[in-house]
UniProtKB/Swiss-Prot annotation:
Pfam family, one: Exonuc_VII_L
Protein name: Exodeoxyribonuclease 7 large subunit
Gene Ontology molecular function: exodeoxyribonuclease VII activity; nucleic acid binding
Primary enzyme class: hydrolase
Gene giving rise to this polypeptide: xseA
Length: 511
């Protein structure tokens, strides 16, 4: 059996560590040695901040890979938005996790690895988005000449928004709606894209009016400061906007991808305000000038028409001048007509005399003899033709009579007789009904006449007064003293003489 001294290192003086001890010692060594380092590398595996606000990714080069983390506090202080593939310089400290034997860098500050790296990334993104057609000039929209509402996407504080509002107020005051965003840092791009999309989703008749034009503005700065406006999400939002967008990011020499996607690029925020609205005073002056030109043109037009009318009136002949030639032609035609009628009458008389001389009693006698002979011949032919016609009609009648059968005639006769009997009965019934109706109507009229007759009034004790001519007396003013009157009662007439001043007592007062 071998002794313990046969195992290598069994009696060595090397210190013995547990796993925890060696891991802790390694952690202290790494953190003490690399407590503050600057690491240059390419961002890999970046997916944006976690829900906690921290960001996890890796820095790599062509031979190694280093895990990295940025805590939420440091993330909010970054002046640019990290992106996949961006080459950066990270400042922080290395640390290890004993539980997994891994190490990483905790980044406190990070910046792009020089303008060259950002420009290379910017050029690659520009080419890719241009290939998708996001910068196509055919997609550009025209700015409205007279907007009602302007939407501004910028920081609510600072000189930019003040310059825009002041410039709009000077040129043509109208409503301005500001959508506040951060114009620098990691959240700049998403906030600007959200603002552009938000303005586009506003309804036309909502409580917040939908702008007619948008201004995305920011002051000047470095490439890193303006990097949020190169964000792909911003470019896509501006390119898809249904509202025309004016880009006013940085100074005139600063170019970002939003400038290529916007419908119009302004060199400064103040220039964007000037593009968005016209100058009210210029519009008023132009309107006044156009109105004056229109009035002058109308005056010249009417003056020219008036002068042309006067010239035409002067050149036009008078009515006597116009009618002189037709009147002379009419007189000449009338004189020619008289002569022509006389000549024509003479010609007709000569022609008639010529025909009259050609006529003679012997010629007339011969013509009469010819006519008598023709009439005699027609008279001789007429009996024979009439006899032939009658024989032909008789033959046709006999032929048709032989074809006729007495049965249809008898049937139709019986049917006609039955119909006549029915008509007779209906006629007698109608006559009786008519006689009864007339008799009832006559009786009703007789009763009505007796009711309306004055004789029925006499039956009730009244009397009718007639004058000497037998006409009824309708009023006392028609009777004079001494007039002979006749009073008719129910049972006869009584003669009376009218007297003056006689008052007849009212029979109703004695009752």
């Amino acid at each position: 059996m071998a002794s313990d001294s046969s195992f290598p290192g069994a009696s060595s003086n090397v210190a013995e560590y547990s796993v925890s001890e060696i891991s802790g010692a390694l952690k202290r060594t790494v953190e003490d040695t690399f407590g503050h380092v600057r690491v240059r590398g390419e961002i890999s595996g970046y997916r944006g901040p976690h829900s906690s606000g921290h960001a996890y990714f890796a820095l790599k080069d062509d031979r190694a890979r280093l895990e990295a983390v940025i805590w939420r506090g440091s993330m909010s202080r970054l002046r640019f938005r990290p992106e996949e593939g961006m080459e950066v310089i990270a400042t922080g400290k290395l640390t290890t996790y004993p539980g997994s034997s891994k190490y990483q860098i905790v980044i406190e500050q990070m910046e792009p690895a020089g303008a060259g790296a950002l420009m290379a990334l910017l050029e690659e993104r520009k080419q890719r988005l241009a290939a998708e057609g996001l910068f196509d000039p055919a997609l550009k929209q025209l700015l409205p000449f007279m907007p009602r509402v302007i939407g501004v996407v910028t920081s609510p504080t600072g000189a930019v928004i003040r310059d825009i509002i002041h410039r709009i107020s000077d040129r043509y005051p109208l409503r301005v709606i500001v959508w506040p965003v951060r114009v620098q840092g990691d959240t700049c791009g998403p906030e600007v894209a959200t603002a552009v999309n938000g303005f586009n989703t506003l309804p036309d008749d909502g409580p917040i009016p939908r702008p007619d034009v948008l201004i995305v503005a920011r002051g000047g700065g470095s490439l890193e400061d303006l990097w949020g406006f190169n964000d792909e999400i911003v470019v896509r939002a501006v390119a898809a906007s249904h509202i025309p967008v004016i880009s006013a990011v940085g100074h005139e020499t600063d170019w970002t991808l939003i400038d290529l996607a916007a419908d119009m690029r302004a060199p400064t925020p103040t220039g964007a305000a000037e593009m968005a609205v016209p100058v009210k005073a210029d519009l008023q002056a132009s309107l006044a000038s156009q109105s004056a030109r229109l009035s002058s043109a109308m005056s010249r037009f009417f003056d020219q028409k008036r002068q042309a009318h006067r010239a035409a009136a002067r050149a036009m002949p008078s009515a006597d001048q116009l009618l002189a030639l037709p009147r002379r032609r009419f007189d000449e035609a009338a004189s020619r007509l008289t002569r022509a009628l006389f000549v024509n009458t003479q010609k007709k008389r000569v022609h008639f005399d010529g025909h009259a001389r050609q006529l003679s009693p012997r010629l007339l006698q011969r013509r009469l003899v010819e006519l008598e002979r023709g009439v005699t011949m027609l008279g001789q032919r007429l009996p024979r033709a009439l006899e032939a016609f009658l024989r032909e009609r008789q033959t046709a009648f006999t032929h048709r009579a032989n074809r006729l059968s007495p049965e249809p005639i008898l049937r139709r006769t019986r049917l006609t007789g039955s119909t006549l009997e029915q008509l007779d009965r209906r006629r007698d019934q109608a006559v009786r009904l008519l006689i009864e109706r007339v008799k009832r109507r006559s009786q009703e009229l007789d009763r009505l006449m007796r009711t309306l007759s004055y004789e029925s009034v006499l039956e009730r004790g009244f009397a009718v007064v007639f004058d000497a001519q037998g006409k009824p007396v309708k009023q006392a003013a028609a009777v004079s003293p001494g007039d002979a009157l006749s009073v008719r009662f129910r049972d006869g007439d009584v003669g009376v003489v009218a007297r003056a001043g006689l008052t007849i007592p009212d029979p109703t007062k004695g009752q």
